[in-house]
Design a protein with these regions (language model features):
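Extracellular/periplasmic catalytic domains that process cell-envelope and extracellular macromolecules
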Residues: 42-44, 64, 72, 89, ...
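Histidine-centered metal-chelating micro-motifs
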Residues: 59-61, 79, 96-109
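N-terminal leader/targeting pre-sequences
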Residues: 87, 102-107, 132-135
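Short acidic-glycine-tyrosine-enriched beta hairpin
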Residues: 54, 84-101
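A short, N-terminal "cap"/entry segment at the start of jelly-roll beta-barrel domains
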Residues: 2-48, 81, 97, 115, ...
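Extracytoplasmic
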Residues: 44-49, 65-68, 85, 101, ...
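Ligand-binding loop in jelly-roll beta-barrel domains
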Residues: 102-128
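Glycine- and acidic-residue-biased ligand/ion/polar-headgroup-sensing regions
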Residues: 65-85, 94
Length: 135
């Protein structure tokens, strides 16, 4: 992935929570790309690994990923849900999955005093942004 493409993806990911910010905007996620790899055995697909930090009080806006997303919590406590699914609270060592048709309705730090950190591995279409507005 070119530097500009990775930078663009990072900016899109970091701005996902700003799609419809509230009047008193909560802190935004800090997203850092770790690696990208074309999946040569799966034509048209690539893997993108990112680290995400939710500062205390972070609340993401509703969005979706045209990807298979595998989340692994490293630190803190987060709350996640997709449309039609149950809200789950995750702590270090726990995982969460989002499919390409899921709408990510809840993504937030459960704490207003401590950060939360997690890694996400996305298997996605090449050339498609990792975060998209909910439809």
């Amino acid at each position: 992935m070119s530097y500009l493409r990775m930078l663009g993806t990072t900016l899109v990911l970091a701005g996902s929570a700003q799609l419809t910010p509230p009047a008193h905007a909560a802190p935004q996620p800090i997203v850092v790309p770790i690696m990208q790899k074309d999946l040569v055995d799966i034509p048209g697909k690539e893997m993108l690994m990112i680290s995400v930090e939710y500062p205390p009080g972070t609340v993401e806006s509703v969005h979706r990923h045209d990807a298979y997303a595998f989340l692994y919590v490293l630190e803190g406590t987060i709350v996640e849900a997709v449309r039609g699914g149950k809200e789950v609270t995750l702590t270090p060592g726990q995982t969460f999955y989002e499919g390409p048709n899921d709408v990510h309705t809840i993504g937030r730090n459960a704490s207003t005093t401590k950060p939360a950190k997690f890694v996400v591995v996305l298997v996605k279409k090449k050339g498609v942004d990792a975060v998209l507005p909910a439809e």
